[in-house]
Amino acid sequence: MQYALDHPALSLTLQAPVSPYGFGGTRRDGTRLTDDDAGTGAGGANADFVQRLTDGDMGDDSPTSPRSVFRSGYVAPGYTSEHEDLWVESMNTTSTATGNYPGDSVDSPNWPGFAPGRIGVLNTMAPRYFDTSGIVDLAQKPPILWVHGTVDAIVSDASFFDLNHLGAIGVIPGWPGEDVAPAQPMVSQTRDVLDAYRAAGGTVTEVVLESVGHSPHLERPALFRRALLEAIGYIGAPADPAPPTEAIILSSSD
């Protein structure tokens, strides 16, 4: 979405996307819960998971190992793949050096006691830095394909990666309540913005995949491939101008 705000685009495909209002810390209409975006950004990263990324951990002996996080967060329960080692190896290429993952945080007087800093991957999604709802006002609106699964643990109206939701269900103590720290309705926010995009003259195609988690392209590769090829004009109604045929390199398996 940010790319489409910064550059002309022929089409836009969103796969299990972050909300247009960032990750955590907003109400449904996108208003920020606190001035410092408490509870969002790098401070929410699990320190043991970060250390295991640094160590290149390939095991599954802990719920915070990259392999366990892949299974519990990135895909739906029961998903298996002969390529799992490759996906975990890819996770372990993440740089945990200062300035990359997860980033820095600062103390906050607001629950849960921290706010995003100024550097790092997770801070880029804090509401103070991330707001792509302006796509509604684009003069030239590329057609949008939105693909997401029904059991996404990461991007959800009840995300297990949203500290406010974790507070509400008792995982994190001291939660100040729904009025102060509600869970972010991520999918509903995306739908609201895309509905407004459609009402303003844009085209939006939504593909909802049952029993699919955060990785539709891995979990339902054939369905994802077909939806993408339809969106960019290779099958069905041709796009104008047509995309280059040399771009077709997508197999229908993972």
Specify the residue positions occupied by each region the protein language model found:
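Conserved hydrolase catalytic core segment
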Residues: 1-31
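A short helix->loop->beta-strand "cap" motif at the edges of active sites that frequently abuts
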Residues: 9-10, 141-142, 201-202
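Hydrophobic/aromatic beta-strand patches that form the interior of the parallel beta-sheet core
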Residues: 13, 145-147, 207
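Surface-exposed intrinsically disordered loops and tails
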Residues: 13-15, 35-41, 203
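Short catalytic/ligand-binding loop motif for oxyanion handling, primarily in non-cytosolic enzymes
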Residues: 21-24, 78, 153-156, 214-217
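Alpha/beta-hydrolase
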Residues: 30-189
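Catalytic active-site module of serine/aspartate enzymes centered on a nucleophile-bearing elbow/loop
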Residues: 162, 170-254
